[in-house]
């Protein structure tokens, strides 16, 4: 049985929305199921459209192939291929901050 974590998403206006995300589901998929409108493109971890930045907590994004080690160390995450591994808070809409 999957462990369910509380994932708080902070949009560009600072509005916080907390959703329950099982550890075997991608954050983006569950956010969409909850009616949230987050940016995405490839859904495969190969671009940066869905990028967010982790404020607190941890994820498993081993399926991603776009971010480099430096970006990951700074807390960037691709929500389309990120599984929560703890309760966490993510600032969404961070693609432009990567460059």
From Swiss-Prot:
Cofactor, how bound (note): Binds 1 [2Fe-2S] cluster.
Domain 2Fe-2S ferredoxin-type, first and last residues per copy: 5-96
Signal sequence extent: none
InterPro entries reported in the protein's UniProt record: 2Fe-2S_ferredoxin-like_sf, 2Fe-2S_ferredoxin-type, 2Fe2S_fd_BS, Beta-grasp_dom_sf, Fd_pln
Cofactor(s) in the UniProt record: [2Fe-2S] cluster
Keywords on record: 2Fe-2S, Electron transport, Iron, Iron-sulfur, Metal-binding, Transport
Residues the entry annotates as binding [2Fe-2S] cluster: 42, 47, 50, 80
Superkingdom, natural source: Bacteria
Database matches in Pfam families: Fer2
A molecular-function term among this protein's GO annotations: 2 iron, 2 sulfur cluster binding
GO biological process per UniProt: electron transport chain
Described purpose of this protein according to its UniProt entry: Ferredoxins are iron-sulfur proteins that transfer electrons in a wide variety of metabolic reactions.
Similarity field: Belongs to the 2Fe2S plant-type ferredoxin family.
Record protein name field: Ferredoxin-1
Lineage, opening ranks: Bacteria, Bacillati, Cyanobacteriota, Cyanophyceae, Nostocales
């Amino acid at each position: 049985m999957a462990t369910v974590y509380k994932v708080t998403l902070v949009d560009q206006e600072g509005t916080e929305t907390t959703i329950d995300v099982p550890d075997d589901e991608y954050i983006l998929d569950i956010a969409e199921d909850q009616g949230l409108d987050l940016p995405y493109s490839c859904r495969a971890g190969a671009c940066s459209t869905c990028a967010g930045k982790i404020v607190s907590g941890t994820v498993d994004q081993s399926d991603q192939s776009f971010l480099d080690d430096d970006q990951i160390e700074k807390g960037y995450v691709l929500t389309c291929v990120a599984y929560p591994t703890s309760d966490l808070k993510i600032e969404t809409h961070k693609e432009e901050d990567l460059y």
